[in-house]
From Swiss-Prot:
InterPro entries: Herpes_US8A. Keywords: Host nucleus, Phosphoprotein. This is Protein US8.5. It comes from Human herpesvirus 1 (strain 17). Its main location: host cell.
Length: 159
């Protein structure tokens, strides 16, 4: 460990309340399960595009979350009410017909090939196979081979 980082950790440990003899549990208030739910106020959620809300949407939804009990479902309903009905000028999940600025090589398919991860997966599968053999009680040699394979494949695993 870096000496400066070690020094920082030692000072951090030295000045923690527990190290100074302060019992935080004794000084804290007991939790009241019947107490009110604390909700912090926040600004209203705006569309991420920065555009104004839909003109047909109501200005303030009756489902908008208040400072009382907050329910995620109510917030989602309020957001959808403020956004208004969906646009009908294009179908959902429509893609543009413009050509891609990055042409694909011939024979390219959109399906991801499992070959992309094979270089990393093959050593890991071998290590897993050795570990399974060792756990089944084949012999102590399996444990040794598992350790060697783990060390040899450390670069491929990014360790």
């Amino acid at each position: 460990m870096d000496p400066a980082l070690r020094s920082y950790h030692q000072r951090l440990r030295l000045y923690t309340p527990v190290a100074m003899g302060i019992n935080l549990a004794a000084s804290s208030q007991p939790l009241d399960p019947e107490g009110p739910i604390a909700v912090t106020p926040r600004p209203p959620i705006r569309p991420s595009s920065g555009k104004a809300p839909h003109p047909e949407a109501p200005r303030r939804s009756p489902n908008w979350a208040t400072a009382g009990e907050v329910d995620v479902g109510d917030e989602l309903i309020a957001i959808s009410d403020e956004r208004g009905p969906p646009r009908h000028d294009r179908p959902p999940l429509a893609t543009s017909t413009a050509p891609s600025p990055h042409p694909r090589p011939p024979g390219y398919t959109a399906v991801v090939s499992p070959m992309a991860l094979q270089a990393v997966d093959a050593p890991s599968l071998f290590v897993a196979w050795l570990a399974a053999r060792w756990l089944r009680g084949a012999s102590g040699l399996g444990a040794v081979l598992c350790g060697i394979a783990w060390y040899v494949t450390s670069i491929a695993r990014g360790a």
